[in-house]
Amino acid sequence: GAGKTTTLRAICNMCSTSGKVLLGEEDISRAGTADIVRKGVAHVPQGRGTFPELSVLDNLMIGAYTRKDKEVKDDVDRWFEIFPRLSERSDQLAGSLSGGEQQMLAVARALMCRPRLLLLDEPSLGLAPLIIEDLFERFTTLNKETGLTMLVVEQNANLALDMADYGYVIESGEITLHGSAEKLKNDPAVQEAYLGA
């Protein structure tokens, strides 16, 4: 591939890297994955990565494993409010959920650690168009309401650029283009190669 998933894995120190990964001013390139989560990075991997044999509620609690505060229950309630289908299925095994519900669960679980940076790897993969639209509207709302930064890896360039402030085009592991989402959407080369124009 182009290296999009590898980029997310490198940020989380899940693969060998050279150079530095900075979160703000802090070098996190040698930190353990649990420390990276504590520092404010949450990763929703491609394929959702829920724990199918655990309940929806147990999956959410795993997302808060690095937290020691007393507000975990409040956050569970908050994500149940934002994703009401999860609340309806809180005792149900994650493996029995639909693809869209599993993706909502994976996102809510990642948000349980109260990240500063949310990494989303192909969040639309295998989902029906209406589910994708709903999910991306929720991402946009979450960003506007909380200021949460999201790094979204997405094959659907139109979808990604519609919600993005800034975009990167990666080919063969190299950043070949970058700029504001608006600039990229209006670039004739991007339109021809990636947007089907």
Language model regions located:
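Glycine-rich phosphate-binding loops of nucleotide-dependent enzymes
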Residues: G1-A197
